[in-house]
Swiss-Prot record:
Described purpose of this protein according to its UniProt entry: Catalyzes the decarboxylative condensation of pimeloyl-[acyl-carrier protein] and L-alanine to produce 8-amino-7-oxononanoate (AON), [acyl-carrier protein], and carbon dioxide.
Reactions catalysed: 6-carboxyhexanoyl-[ACP] + L-alanine + H(+) = (8S)-8-amino-7-oxononanoate + holo-[ACP] + CO2
Protein name: 8-amino-7-oxononanoate synthase
Gene3D superfamilies according to UniProt: Aspartate Aminotransferase, domain 1 (3.90.1150.10), Type I PLP-dependent aspartate aminotransferase-like (Major domain) (3.40.640.10)
GO molecular function per UniProt: 8-amino-7-oxononanoate synthase activity; pyridoxal phosphate binding
Superkingdom assignment: Bacteria
Sequence positions bearing N6-(pyridoxal phosphate)lysine: K235
EC number of this enzyme: 2.3.1.47
Involved pathway(s): Cofactor biosynthesis; biotin biosynthesis
Biological process annotations from GO: biotin biosynthetic process
Length: 384
């Protein structure tokens, strides 16, 4: 029987290799502001989600070091035992005050936060409605939950309206900014549509810190307040982890019944301390968003006439190429020129929509953007 495991694993790996869809870890020596180093060669890094340039910021590094000196290296237990400290409580309070919620529940990753929410909240009689392009963590959780899951066409509020049933206990889930396409959900229209008919949950992993007043995210920018808001700390915060923002009752429910929370070791308190500092930097250092906006405008101006360009209002700039081979080839050619841009292929994106996923951060310069555009133009002209 054990040979079946081996055979099945080998078959799956061979099929992925044959389809040229194998993904491999990229061993990096270190990263710096807007750059990364691999085997002693420096590349411009246009594949990072560090939108505000905080991941290598000296002020944030110092905050983590201060947290280590004060709280030690790890939490030592789950939050429900002895793993919850004053550093965690301060982070929760900061998030609630900033984003306007009664409770914030911390998780080790956005993936675990999304899975915990859908596994815990949904029951067999419930209806889960998800945008077709939602993140894999949401889709997988929806498929494994006891609820009936239906997907509405991407950003299509009319299709969502057709799927909503007033008699059902419904949860509508969308991302604020979609991670592979860089477009924004029509949150105001969705919120109006679901009002008093369903709960709304927004995963704002790629909007928090970047959009809205004081970086409060997609929902604040759209003027809405969903019942559940998920924010993650691996993008604009420059760190790792996630939080679920909700009312007091939902927060208590998650604390009691969300297994990802109850049975996982709490994030290190030094990390929570650094995250609180990152949240305050995001709110107070508006120059980072202003600088990012200037760089996004520069990118659009330099690239709009190059084949494959897709306009977005966010730091995520998909460059659609279609085939996986085309995306891999373009990524390789850019790397040869010292520019690191990842090729995104199925199953991460639908078949026929392979792309370069270019991300702009506040740590870049306009000179670096111009260099990227010149090389993109060269690669696209060569391929056509």
């Amino acid at each position: 029987m054990t040979l079946r495991f081996k055979s099945r694993i080998e078959q799956a790996l061979n099929e992925r290799e044959h389809s040229r869809l194998t993904r491999r870890l990229q061993l990096l020596d270190r990263s710096a502001q807007g750059e990364l180093i691999q085997q002693d060669r420096t590349y411009l890094n246009f594949s990072s989600n560090d939108y505000l340039g905080l991941a290598n910021d000296a002020e944030l590094v110092q905050a983590w070091q201060t947290g280590l000196a004060r709280f030690g290296a790890g939490s030592g237990a789950s939050p429900m035992v002895t793993g919850f400290s004053s550093a965690h409580a301060e982070l929760e309070h900061e998030l609630c005050h900033w984003l306007g919620y009664e409770r914030a529940v911390l998780f080790s990753s956005g993936f675990s936060a999304n899975q915990a929410l859908l596994f815990t909240l949904l029951e067999k009689e419930d209806l889960l409605l998800q945008d077709k392009l939602n993140h894999a963590s949401l889709m997988e959780a929806g498929m494994l939950s006891p609820a009936t899951m239906k997907r509405f066409k991407h950003n299509d509020t009319e299709h969502l309206r057709q799927l909503l049933h007033e008699q059902s206990n419904s949860l509508v889930v969308t991302e604020g900014v979609f991670s592979m396409d860089g477009d924004c959900a029509p949150l105001a229209q969705i919120a109006t549509l679901v009002k008093q008919r369903a709960w709304l949950m927004v995963d704002d992993a790629h909007g928090i810190g970047v959009l809205g007043e004081d970086g409060a995210g997609s929902c604040q920018a759209a003027g809405i307040h969903p019942e559940i808001l998920v924010v993650t700390f691996g993008k604009a915060f420059g760190l790792a982890g996630a939080a679920v923002l909700c009312d007091a009752h939902v927060g208590d429910y998650l604390t009691q019944f969300a297994r990802h929370h109850v049975y996982s070791t709490a994030m290190p308190p030094a990390q929570a301390h650094a995250l609180t500092h990152a949240a305050r930097m995001i709110q107070s250092q508006s120059w980072r968003r202003e600088q990012l906006a200037e760089l996004l405008a520069c990118f659009d101006e330099q690239c709009r006439n190059i084949p494959g360009f897709v306009a977005t209002q966010t730091p995520i700039k998909p460059w659609l190429l279609g085939s996986s081979d085309s995306a891999l080839s373009a990524s390789h050619e850019l790397k040869q020129q010292g520019i690191w841009v990842s090729a995104i292929r199925p199953p991460t994106v639908p078949v026929g929509s392979a792309r370069l996923r270019i991300t702009i951060t506040a740590a870049h310069t306009q000179a670096q953007i111009r260099r990227l555009s010149e090389q993109l133009k060269h690669v696209m002209e060569k391929d056509t």
